[in-house]
């Protein structure tokens, strides 16, 4: 879910001017018809219909906001876990022997986050995967259906290599593994939001009834 910080008014106007023009023409037709052939429409049904529509639209807006808030929380969890992983790599691994591994883990996490961003937006992640990783290092992950998850698995293997080399102990490895689990859980939540959009009924019925209300409104006001 990509939301601009500042509304794009030109884009909004470009999307709504045609329906507004059609409604304006319809309002003129209803008004002219009323003066030529006077009629009286009851206002109570329209009032009840408008109240029900407001509740329906409010419920849909609440559902959409909850999804946005959950996505925001998941991305915040990803940021915090990435910082924790970077801090653990710099704190646990020795500065001399493990400097290259420190850098590799941090660069892999940077690559992972950007590849995940591309996957969620249905963009090709190859360019981001090769930005900080060598072709040989990125190749195993690029061959997988879920490239981001492949990169994360590779990070776990790097941590295990550090334990086998004696640079970290099993307790430190378990601590880093918990951070990787938090990262994987955040990714799973984001993919769930992406792959499970709001049902079509949430989109179709509010739009249909809103259009119907706009058509009936001038009839009830004249």
Cite the ranges covered by each PLM segment.
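Solvent-exposed interaction patches of small proteins and small membrane subunits
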Residues: 9, 13, 36, 140-144, ...
């Amino acid at each position: 879910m990509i939301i601009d910080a500042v509304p794009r008014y030109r884009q909004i106007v470009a999307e709504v001017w045609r329906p507004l023009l059609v409604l304006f023409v319809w309002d003129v037709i209803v008004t002219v018809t009323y003066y030529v052939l006077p009629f009286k429409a009851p206002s109570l049904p329209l009032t009840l219909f408008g109240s029900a529509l407001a509740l329906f639209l409010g419920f849909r807006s609440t559902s959409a906001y909850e999804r946005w808030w959950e996505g925001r929380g998941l991305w915040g969890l990803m940021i915090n876990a990435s910082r924790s992983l970077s801090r653990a790599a710099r704190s646990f691994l020795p500065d001399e022997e493990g400097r290259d591994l420190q850098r590799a883990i941090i660069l892999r996490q940077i690559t992972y986050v950007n590849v995940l961003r591309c996957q969620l937006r249905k963009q090709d992640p190859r360019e981001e995967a090769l930005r900080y990783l060598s072709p040989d290092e990125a190749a195993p992950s690029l061959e997988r259906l879920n490239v981001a998850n492949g990169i994360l698995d590779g990070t776990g293997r790097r941590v295990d290599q550090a334990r086998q080399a004696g640079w970290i102990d099993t307790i430190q490895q378990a601590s880093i593994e918990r951070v990787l689990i938090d990262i994987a859980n955040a990714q799973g939540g984001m993919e769930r939001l992406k792959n499970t959009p709001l049902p079509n009924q949430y989109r179709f019925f509010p739009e249909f009834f809103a259009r119907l209300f706009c058509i009936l409104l001038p009839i009830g006001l004249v």
